[in-house]
UniProtKB/Swiss-Prot annotation:
<dbReference type="InterPro" id="IPR020826">
    <property type="entry name" value="Transketolase_BS"/>
</dbReference>
<protein>
    <recommendedName>
        <fullName>Transketolase 1</fullName>
        <ecNumber>2.2.1.1</ecNumber>
    </recommendedName>
</protein>
<feature type="binding site">
    <location>
        <position position="185"/>
    </location>
    <ligand>
        <name>Mg(2+)</name>
    </ligand>
</feature>
<feature type="binding site">
    <location>
        <position position="260"/>
    </location>
    <ligand>
        <name>thiamine diphosphate</name>
    </ligand>
</feature>
<keyword id="KW-0479">Metal-binding</keyword>
<feature type="binding site">
    <location>
        <position position="437"/>
    </location>
    <ligand>
        <name>thiamine diphosphate</name>
    </ligand>
</feature>
<feature type="binding site">
    <location>
        <position position="66"/>
    </location>
    <ligand>
        <name>thiamine diphosphate</name>
    </ligand>
</feature>
<dbReference type="Pfam" id="PF00456">
    <property type="entry name" value="Transketolase_N"/>
</dbReference>
<feature type="binding site">
    <location>
        <position position="357"/>
    </location>
    <ligand>
        <name>substrate</name>
    </ligand>
</feature>
<dbReference type="GO" id="GO:0004802">
    <property type="term" value="F:transketolase activity"/>
</dbReference>
<feature type="binding site">
    <location>
        <position position="469"/>
    </location>
    <ligand>
        <name>substrate</name>
    </ligand>
</feature>
<feature type="binding site">
    <location>
        <begin position="114"/>
        <end position="116"/>
    </location>
    <ligand>
        <name>thiamine diphosphate</name>
    </ligand>
</feature>
<feature type="binding site">
    <location>
        <position position="384"/>
    </location>
    <ligand>
        <name>substrate</name>
    </ligand>
</feature>
<dbReference type="InterPro" id="IPR055152">
    <property type="entry name" value="Transketolase-like_C_2"/>
</dbReference>
<dbReference type="InterPro" id="IPR005474">
    <property type="entry name" value="Transketolase_N"/>
</dbReference>
<comment type="subunit">
    <text>Homodimer.</text>
</comment>
<dbReference type="InterPro" id="IPR005478">
    <property type="entry name" value="Transketolase_bac-like"/>
</dbReference>
Length: 664
């Protein structure tokens, strides 16, 4: 029977070989963490390679995602549908083994990692989801939600500021089933880290309220195993500090940055094989090593045992069992569509001139009663973002049965935690901050779009309309940057009806994130027919039309729709034929068929004006070079909102004059 070291060396060999064949990659971390991975995956991780979606599996996150050959080797050796040919295709076009682990490619990859610090933060979200689902569904004698979240991370993750945001919150909330392994190898790309990373990391995590196990030999299986056992027994999140040698087994490159991010080279790989006593050719794993690694039988047994537990739970608590299944499957309640449409129709029938952030809160109030899977939150701005509703109950360390997270001032952490919650399953997460401060969270929203996961962000105070707080808080280019992100659904509604439609579609959207952008100031509700209400879901529609073919089209979003309507009324009174198009979601409008888009924006009507209190340049694709844009071309100013709108040209007079110049 092969020794533990020999089993770990299988990871080292595959990692060296994969990087060498690709002629690029990172062999150092997989070789350094192979012993830890062997102990965790063979001795502790509850998973089933035949069903990577088993609901109560332990989650494993490789936060130092550049070491991707580690997880690909583990998945292959354990029996997942990841063949040796897939490993040979590492980093090649359309392979299941991209350079960094990507969710949705290889089975068993729980999240996309690579941007350092986000993996540990996703893991915090997964652990929060586990604790919340357990609090909501477990019953005495029925622990049907009961699993750990394990994460590997390196010095780079710990240097990234997001690790502070996430790990601080994890300690505050007492996430006892979160176990992190710090790959303390003292090396980063530039060399030895003591010149730029001399923190006392164990003390840092103790200050967060974590259980810290210091100075574990990352190449000693017994020490690693004892640390994991101690971690599992402690009610706090645990940091296991594993001292490792980067590139372990490479005689001339281990312990240096030379093995971090480049192939070892044929000569050094041969020397490493000799040093490790690994006598097999590239990509060749002996049968006895495969047999020891194979987790299919044990995994199927564990899942079968859990299925029996779930059947007993379902017999005792049929309603709860059906509800848990629905939520884990990502299904909406049976009456959702009918009730949601009725709510929207009622809003249209009962006009209210309110801020769209208030309209958003009203939508939460109406929809939230149907959605126990909501997991809301805000980055310390709940009274401003209006993200709490009557059914909101805050999560606390000793009571996780609620549905609202106080993230504190942690925009980036909040957004990446929400990605983890969404990936875990069982919840529809929404979070919030001022639109200006989505900048802090941008990369996590990009990751949500890349992974195609549901992450609903409420971004309020959407323009110079927030007024006196000034340009530090007034967004200008942010809406455009969200719209330019692939697979991002971005909504800027003009009233309570469009706001409710935006919320409904964000709740229904399971294949990507949604940015819902709301105003601080009150907005007038627009009259609509039932057909127009239905057309809101198309992202852009004719809100007010001319008699006969229009000679001018005004396109507007959010707070500027009201302005466009008033300008159109004045121009119409002066004999002009003017159409107003409300376009709350440009990406959604762009997905409509050509006939619909042509019906709304006829190509032979070239006199067009776009009006939005955001960066002007975005709108050229809709108005053309012959059109006009009334938008922002500079940062804002500190002043009352009405003065700012006048100063920057968002007035009926300016729209009317611009239209007349265009039509002249």
């Amino acid at each position: 029977m092969p020794s533990r070291k020999h089993l770990a060396n299988a990871i080292r060999a595959l990692s060296m070989d994969g990087v060498q064949k690709a002629n690029s990659g990172h062999p150092g971390a997989p070789m350094g963490m192979a012993d830890i991975a062997e102990v965790l995956w063979r001795g502790h991780l509850n998973h089933n390679p035949s069903n990577p979606e088993w609901a109560d599996r332990d989650r494993f996150v490789l936060s130092n995602g550049h070491g991707s050959m580690l997880i690909y080797s583990l998945l292959h050796l354990s029996g997942y549908e990841l063949s040796i040919d897939d490993l040979k295709n590492f980093r090649q076009l359309h392979s299941k083994t991209p350079g960094h682990p990507e969710y949705g490619y290889a089975p068993g990859i729980e999240t996309t990692t690579g941007p350092l610090g986000q993996g540990i933060t996703n893991a915090v979200g997964m652990a929060m989801a586990e604790k919340a689902l357990a609090a909501q569904f477990n019953k005495p004698g029925h622990d049907i939600v009961d699993h750990f979240t394990y994460v590997f991370m390196g010095d780079g993750c710990l240097m990234e500021g997001i690790s502070h945001e996430a790990c601080s919150l994890a300690g505050t909330l007492g996430l006892g089933k979160l176990i992190a392994f710090w790959d303390d190898n003292g090396i980063s790309i530039d060399g030895h880290v003591e010149g730029w990373f001399s923190d006392d990391t164990p003390k840092r995590f103790e200050a967060y309220g974590w259980h810290v196990i210091p100075a574990v030999d990352g190449h000693n299986a017994e020490a690693i195993n004892a640390a994991i056992e101690a971690a599992k027994a402690d009610p706090r999140p645990t940091l296991i500090c594993t001292k490792t040698i980067i590139g372990f087994g490479s005689p001339n490159k281990s312990g240096s940055h030379d093995c971090h991010g480049a192939p070892l080279g044929a000569e050094e790989i041969a020397a490493a094989r000799e040093f490790l006593g690994w006598e097999h050719p590239a990509f060749e794993i002996p049968a006895d090593v495969y047999a020891e690694w194979d987790a299919k039988a044990a995994g199927a047994e564990k899942e079968a045992a859990w299925n029996a537990k779930f059947d007993a739970y379902a017999a005792a608590y049929p309603t709860e069992a059906a509800e848990l299944k629905r939520r884990l499957n990502g299904e909406l309640p049976a009456e959702w569509e009918e009730k949601a449409n009725q709510i929207i129709a009622d809003l249209q029938a009962n006009p209210a001139n309110i801020a769209s952030r208030k309209a958003s809160q009203n939508a939460l109030e109406a929809f939230g009663k149907m959605l126990p899977e909501f997991m809301g939150g805000s980055a310390d701005l709940a009274p401003s973002n209006l993200t709490m509703w009557s059914g909101s109950k805050s999560l606390e360390a000793n009571d996780f049965s609620g549905n609202y997270i106080h993230y504190g001032v942690r925009e980036f952490g909040m957004t990446a935690i929400m990605n983890g919650i969404a990936l875990h399953g069982g919840f529809v997460p929404y979070g919030a901050t001022f639109l200006m401060f989505m900048e802090y969270a941008r990369n996590a929203m990009r990751m949500a779009a890349l992974m195609k996961v549901q992450n609903i962000q409420v971004y309020t105070h959407d323009s110079i309309g927030l007024g006196e707080d000034g340009p530090t808080h007034q967004p200008v280019e942010q809406i455009a940057s969200l719209r330019l992100t692939p697979n991002m659904s971005t909504w800027r509604p003009c009233d309570q009806v469009e706001s409710a439609v935006a919320w409904k579609l964000a709740i229904e959207r399971k294949d990507g994130p949604s940015a819902l952008i709301f105003s601080r100031q009150n907005l007038a509700q627009q009259p609509r027919s039932a057909e127009q209400v239905a057309d809101i879901a198309k992202g852009g529609y004719i809100l007010k039309d001319s008699d006969g073919k229009p000679e001018l089209i005004l396109i507007a979003t959010g707070s500027e729709v009201e302005l466009a309507v008033k300008a159109a009324e004045q121009l119409t009174a002066e004999g002009k034929k003017v159409r107003v198009v409300s376009m709350p979601a440009t990406d959604t409008f762009d997905k409509q068929d050509a006939a619909y888009r042509e019906a709304v924006l006829p190509s032979d009507v070239t006199a067009r004006i776009a009006i939005e209190a955001g960066i002007a340049d975005f709108w050229y694709k809709y108005v053309g070079f012959d059109g006009r844009i009334i938008g922002m071309t500079t940062f804002g100013e500190s002043a009352p909102a009405d003065q700012l709108f006048e100063m920057f040209g968002f007035t009926v007079e300016n729209v009317v004059n611009t239209a007349k110049e265009l039509l002249a």
